[in-house]
């Protein structure tokens, strides 16, 4: 299932406040306060959750937009994945420009899994 925020732009921190807090705290503790601020400001594009596999993903729109050369000539690709010792179930995906583009959640805790499941069922905008 997928949830899209076409007409209703909300930050990651407002859609998933507890998860944003935990991930941002971990980023700050490891010297990545820049990414913590970016995570809190990113706009949620889509939320997906596969109940059978117990895997979720949140696609993010970073605050910093690509310029025309980056977008049309270089192109956006997956650049880096940041994993955490706590929480182990979450990882961040950065593009080849170092911008945050997604959060992957493998076997999240039951409450977060429920929130992902519910959020992925919503249809906001057209």
Please report, for each region that a protein language model flagged, where it lies by residue.
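Intrinsically disordered terminal and processing segments
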Residues: 2-91, 96-97, 103, 107-126
């Amino acid at each position: 299932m997928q949830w899209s925020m076409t007409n209703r732009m909300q930050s990651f921190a407002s859609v998933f406040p507890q998860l944003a807090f935990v991930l941002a705290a971990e980023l700050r503790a490891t010297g990545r306060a820049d990414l913590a601020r970016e995570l809190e400001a990113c706009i949620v594009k889509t939320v997906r959750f596969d109940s059978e596999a117990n895997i979720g993903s949140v696609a993010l729109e970073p605050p910093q937009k690509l310029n025309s050369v980056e977008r049309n000539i270089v192109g956006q690709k997956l650049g880096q994945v940041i994993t955490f010792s706590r929480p182990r179930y979450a990882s961040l995906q950065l593009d080849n420009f170092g911008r945050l583009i997604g959060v992957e959640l493998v076997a999240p805790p039951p409450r977060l899994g429920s929130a992902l499941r519910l959020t992925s069922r919503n249809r906001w905008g057209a």
